[in-house]
């Protein structure tokens, strides 16, 4: 009867399953437990075998790792040296560390020897794999003395063999680099190479061969003598920069002579509005460019001083830096009435009656106006991008320009007659408020104040609030006792 007591713990599930089958379940459980014990014992043995099997692939993996290290090539030399150091440390572990790790490694020792034999067999077939065979050297301390006597000779030979080709591989690009400094300054050749490849796709494929001379030739033809001078300077940055400085410095003269690169860069600047470089470099010319435009189109010089008054203008204009010169060009080249009717078309009817619609119109303007790109982009961006406070400032800018234009002045003085930026918006709001009051007064009838009864005079008196009384009672502790009682029972629980 000693067996039933152990099944005593499991019977509750057996009771839940079936009450009558307890003895049979006990027998099966006994057999199952015996089988489990035997399986557990076998499992331990199997685990030992599994450890041996695992140790074998782990020991084989260094070969695979060695092969992969061999595949790394240039790093194989340093890896081989590191492997040699690891081999020495491995020898130390093999000699002094068997008590700690010896159980696993000693079990795998014969397989290490077999792998060493495999290396002997396949040593000729795997010459490149052996250089990282530095790990074979790491296995050498484990292998018998005869093994290391055999391996060290071939392994150093193999080490010396394969690391040389990676070195040979490494230097050939360096002579290419050396050839690059012949045509370009030595420190920069690597950097300017990618930059021209990004700027000109032709240069990247042709860069390796002799066509390097036409490469600077093309740049010299594109960028001019100044850029040719900057090319020998050898800084990668001047390649993107040369088009930028001539544009602000020479203004509009450079556009016709170097058509391909600067024009390609400028449309990208106009469309992409490349903010970081052009804005920084051209921030000073921005005020200069619009002011000459104003001087050329509108004789009165006062607008520029009024313009610097509102600070938000320069940042907004920075986004449109390249577009401002286009506006001048387009206004000078194309007939001025084009922008005037385009802008005055929607405006004249509403301004006097509806101050809000001019605020709503700019998106409408931006919608219909885009087809004539330069003027309308400037107008749309000038009105859509900047906030409402900038609109009056731009209207102030346009007012001198539109001085000769009859329709515009009546439109914008309505909104721009008051002092320029903030008061104009506030005045617009005032117009809106007044118009709303007019609408309400026209719609509804309001009693005069005289018809309304006078309010009761204010008399300072102490007032009592029942809610405060209840709070005072709760503070007194009457409610605290009631509230304090329930939390106490859960505490003893």
Curated annotation (Swiss-Prot):
Residues 67-105 have a biased composition (Gly residues). The modification Asymmetric dimethylarginine is found at residue 33. Residues 1-493 are annotated as: Disordered. Residues 1-14, 142-155, 162-175, 183-195, 239-248, 274-290, 298-315, 336-361, 403-424 have a biased composition (Pro residues). GO terms for cellular component: actin cytoskeleton; actin filament; cytoplasmic vesicle; ruffle. XRSGPXPPXP motif repeats lie at residues 342-351, 364-373, 400-409. Recruited to PIP5K-induced vesicle surfaces in the absence of functional WASL. The modification Phosphoserine is found at residues 143, 227, 330, 340. Binds to WAS within the N-terminal region, at a site distinct from the CDC42-binding site. Binds profilin and actin. Binds to WASL. Interacts with DBNL. Interacts with DBNL. Interacts with FNBP1L (via the SH3 domain). Residues 45-48 are annotated as: Binds actin. Residues 470-484 have a biased composition (Basic and acidic residues). This is WAS/WASL-interacting protein family member 1. One of its GO terms (biological process) is actin filament-based movement. The modification Omega-N-methylarginine is found at residues 126, 135. It comes from the Eukaryota. Residues 21-31, 425-434 have a biased composition (Polar residues). Its main location: cytoplasm. GO terms for molecular function: actin binding; cytoskeletal anchor activity; SH3 domain binding. Residues 32-49 form the WH2 domain. Gene3D superfamilies: Pleckstrin-homology domain (PH domain)/Phosphotyrosine-binding domain (PTB). Plays a role in the reorganization of the actin cytoskeleton. Contributes with NCK1 and GRB2 in the recruitment and activation of WASL. May participate in regulating the subcellular localization of WASL, resulting in the disassembly of stress fibers in favor of filopodia formation. Plays a role in the formation of cell ruffles. Belongs to the verprolin family. InterPro entries: PH-like_dom_sf (IPR011993), WAS/WASL-interacting_domain (IPR053099), WH2_dom (IPR003124). It is found in: Cytoplasmic vesicle; Cytoplasm, Cytoskeleton; Cell projection, Ruffle.
């Amino acid at each position: 009867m000693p067996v039933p007591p152990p099944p005593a713990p499991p019977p509750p599930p057996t009771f839940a399953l079936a009450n009558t089958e307890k003895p049979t379940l006990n027998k099966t459980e006994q057999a199952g437990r015996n089988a489990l014990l035997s399986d557990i014992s076998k499992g331990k043995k199997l685990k030992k075998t599994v450890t041996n099997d695992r140790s074998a692939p782990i020991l084989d993996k260094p070969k695979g790792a060695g092969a992969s290290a061999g595949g790394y090539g240039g790093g194989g030399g340093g890896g081989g040296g590191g492997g040699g150091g690891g081999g020495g440390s491995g020898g130390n572990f093999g000699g002094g560390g068997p008590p700690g790790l010896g159980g696993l490694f000693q079990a795998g020792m014969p397989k290490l020897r077999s792998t060493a034999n495999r290396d002997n067999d396949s040593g000729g077939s795997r010459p490149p794999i052996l250089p990282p065979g530095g790990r074979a050297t790491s296995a050498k301390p484990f292998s018998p003395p005869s093994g290391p006597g055999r391996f060290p000779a071939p392994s150093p030979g193999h080490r010396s063999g394969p690391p040389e080709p990676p070195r040979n591989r490494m230097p050939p690009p360096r002579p290419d680099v050396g050839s690059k400094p012949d045509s370009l300054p030595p420190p920069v050749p690597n950097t300017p190479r990618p930059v021209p490849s990004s700027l000109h796709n032709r240069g990247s494929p042709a860069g390796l061969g002799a066509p390097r001379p036409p490469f600077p030739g093309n740049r010299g033809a594109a960028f001019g003598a100044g850029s040719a001078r900057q090319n020998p300077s050898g800084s990668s940055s001047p390649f993107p920069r040369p088009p930028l400085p001539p544009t602000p410095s020479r203004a509009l003269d450079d556009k016709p002579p170097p058509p391909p690169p600067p024009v390609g860069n400028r449309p990208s600047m106009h469309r992409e509005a490349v903010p970081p470089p052009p804005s920084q470099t051209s921030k000073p010319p921005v005020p200069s460019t619009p002011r000459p435009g104003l001087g050329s189109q509108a004789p009165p010089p006062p607008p520029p001083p009024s313009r610097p008054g509102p600070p938000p203008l320069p940042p907004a204009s920075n986004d449109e830096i390249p577009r401002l010169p286009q506006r001048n060009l387009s206004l000078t080249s194309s007939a001025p009435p084009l922008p005037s009717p385009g802008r005055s078309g929607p405006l004249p009817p509403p301004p006097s009656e509806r101050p809000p619609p001019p605020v709503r119109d700019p998106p409408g303007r931006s919608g219909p106006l885009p087809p004539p790109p330069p003027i309308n982009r400037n107008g749309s961006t000038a009105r859509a991008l900047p906030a409402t406070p900038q609109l009056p400032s731009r209207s102030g800018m346009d007012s001198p320009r539109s001085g000769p234009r009859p329709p515009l002045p009546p439109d914008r003085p309505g909104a721009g007659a008051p002092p320029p930026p903030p008061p104009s918006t506030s005045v617009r709001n005032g117009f809106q408020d007044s118009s709303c009051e007019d609408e309400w007064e026209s719609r509804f009838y309001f009693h005069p104040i005289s018809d309304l009864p006078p309010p009761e005079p204010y008399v300072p008196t102490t007032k009592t609030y029942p809610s405060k009384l209840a709070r005072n009672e709760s503070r007194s502790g009457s409610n605290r006792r009631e509230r304090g009682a329930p939390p106490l029972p859960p505490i003893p629980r």
